[in-house]
UniProtKB/Swiss-Prot annotation:
Superkingdom of origin organism: Bacteria
GO cellular component: cytosol
A single GO BP: translation
Protein's name according to its UniProt entry: Ribosome maturation factor RimP
Classification via Pfam families: DUF150_C (PF17384), RimP_N (PF02576)
Role of this protein: Required for maturation of 30S ribosomal subunits.
InterPro entries: Ribosome_maturation_RimP, RimP_C, RimP_C_sf, RimP_N, RimP_N_sf
Length: 216
């Protein structure tokens, strides 16, 4: 790997316990990578959000992380990159040439833990379920009535005949993420005044920094 692509938000929103389990996990190669990196992240006070293998613009292995105490600096992203990249090379997880991308969750973040849903209650999210509810598996709406068992999604764009309120248990969710809206951006920018992106060349210790807005 010649290039590591790092996307990082400064001062990310405060999260809860680093040991809080995720609601859903990866499969295949992504699950293997997750199993490798989680033990490396925890002693450094990081926790895994997700692992995703992307095919756009070549092969990219995205490892999305966050700190449990709510902070996530560019230096933190660099630390994670240095910590996991050597092990991934030694394990030869992906035989093809690929880019390693270390990323913080971003504004329209995935919702992978119960605390994520509690924290972002009142914002719009897209949710996909394992089992159909009212003949559907994909939903969009405002997160509401969050409990330890599940949530209510107040659909903001319900078609004629569709229910306005959908009760979704956590154990039926396979994917969920926030929808980028003006309100979400305003809320996030109050917590994250500086969104940063940067490339780190493994052959060059110098880091070039470029500030820009980041969308997953």
């Amino acid at each position: 790997m010649k290039l590591t692509w790092i996307k990082c938000m400064r001062k990310t929103e405060k999260m809860n316990d680093i040991d809080e389990p995720r609601l859903f996990e990866e499969t295949g190669i992504e699950a293997f990578v997750a199993a490798l990196v989680i033990p490396l992240l925890k002693p450094l006070d990081f926790r895994l959000v997700r692992v995703k293998l992307l095919g756009q613009n070549g092969l990219t292995l995205q490892i999305m992380v966050e700190r449990a105490d709510g902070s996530m600096t560019i230096e933190d992203c660099e630390t994670v990159s240095r910590t996991v990249s050597h092990l991934l090379d030694v394990q030869n997880v992906i035989e093809r040439k690929y880019h390693l991308e270390i990323s913080s969750p971003g504004i329209d973040r995935p919702l992978v833990r119960k605390s994520d849903f509690f924290h972002w209650q009142g914002h719009i999210a897209k949710i996909e379920t394992k089992i159909t509810i009212d003949g559907r598996k994909k939903f969009r709406g405002i997160l509401a009535n969050i409990t330890q068992e599940g949530l209510t999604l107040n659909t903001d764009k319900a078609a004629y005949g569709e229910a306005m309120y959908i009760a979704i248990p956590f154990d039926n969710i396979i994917d969920a993420h926030l929808v980028l809206t003006d309100e979400l951006i305003r809320n996030a920018l109050k917590k994250n005044k500086d969104l940063s992106q940067q490339f780190i060349s493994e052959d060059n210790p110098n880091v070039s920094k470029q500030l820009s807005n980041y969308k997953n």
